[in-house]
Amino acid sequence: MKILLICHDGAQLDQVILARWLSSFSNLVGIVIIQEPPSLLWRRVRREVKRIGAFRFLDVLALRLYYRIFLSGKDQQWERQELREKCFIYGDIPSRTAILETPSPNTQETETFIRRLNPDIVLARCKVLLKESIFSIPSKGTFVMHPGICPEYRNAHGCFWALANRDLTKVGMTLLRIDKGVDTGPAFGYYTYPFDEVHESHIVIQHRVVMENLDALRSKFLEIFSGTAAPLNTSGRPSAVWGQPWLTKYLQWKSHAKRGRQ
């Protein structure tokens, strides 16, 4: 089973841990490392302002600032510990693994790189929507570990919005096969863990729904490769796209969570 990983430069849990994990049960033929130019950040900012308005975007920025001041230190400590533990479990990737550094996963260079390696499966751990010319290359499909339960919590922050909405049975990750839509492809599994919404941040919860389920995910990828995995039936369920987290919703969530413990 040949697998290729797409991830962002500096995303250590993906670039290091998931790469080692994939290599432990498959032939990790390549890694596409995305090094985005600053212009893409401003493009995302303009798109989000247009979508939710300038006032609500201040709410988004307020949470970013709050997180950096009050939460990021503890989360970075958790990530360092996770890296140490998982690097002890999973050995380094082979030196033969091909590496491509690119500003975008949708370039012609990336397409040529993936076609040359001819993976059976691509695991895309990136914020960028992939072109069909990219995600259609692997014979078994391109998959994402979506941070949210689909179809109810589509887009990049589904775990946060499920927590903020007190929809606690929908806090988890969906293994999706990419199609032409935004998180609309067939789901092959839901994954969660006994999260602590009082003491853990939404970022840690979003990471742990993946990291606590690596054994189960390994089994699922092997089923997908062998052709025995069937997509879940999600017909008739509500579908919604969610945006960036807000500070007001974060504070409401934590307040509800703490009251629930009393």
Predicted regions, residues:
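One-carbon transfer enzymes
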Residues: 1-262
